[in-house]
């Protein structure tokens, strides 16, 4: 399951992300953060952590450096 999720994120980064303008307010980007979270915490907890991060990625949040803890 973990590898499938990471594969989906990588496909998003390769095929969908280039069609959009860069908009992630964080470093590492939300997709890289998601990969790192899934690798570190597994499919379920990593996905939940990723969703929490993606919900913070909006114009009213200043963003910045936010590594997986």
From Swiss-Prot:
Location (main, coarse): membrane
Whether Membrane counts among this entry's keywords is yes
InterPro entries given in the database record: Membr_insert_effic_factor_YidD
Q: How does it sit in the membrane?
A: Peripheral membrane protein
- What are the record's GO terms for cellular component? plasma membrane
Similarity remark: Belongs to the UPF0161 family.
User: Which protein, by its recorded name, is this?
Assistant: Putative membrane protein insertion efficiency factor
Q: Which organism is it from?
A: Clostridium botulinum (strain Hall / ATCC 3502 / NCTC 13319 / Type A)
């Amino acid at each position: 399951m973990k590898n499938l999720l990471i594969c989906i994120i990588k496909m998003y980064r390769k095929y969908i992300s280039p069609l959009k303008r860069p908009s992630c307010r964080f470093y590492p980007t939300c997709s890289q953060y998601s990969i790192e979270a899934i690798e570190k915490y597994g499919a379920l907890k990593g996905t939940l952590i990723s969703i929490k991060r993606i919900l913070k990625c909006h114009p009213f949040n200043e963003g910045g450096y936010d590594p997986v803890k």
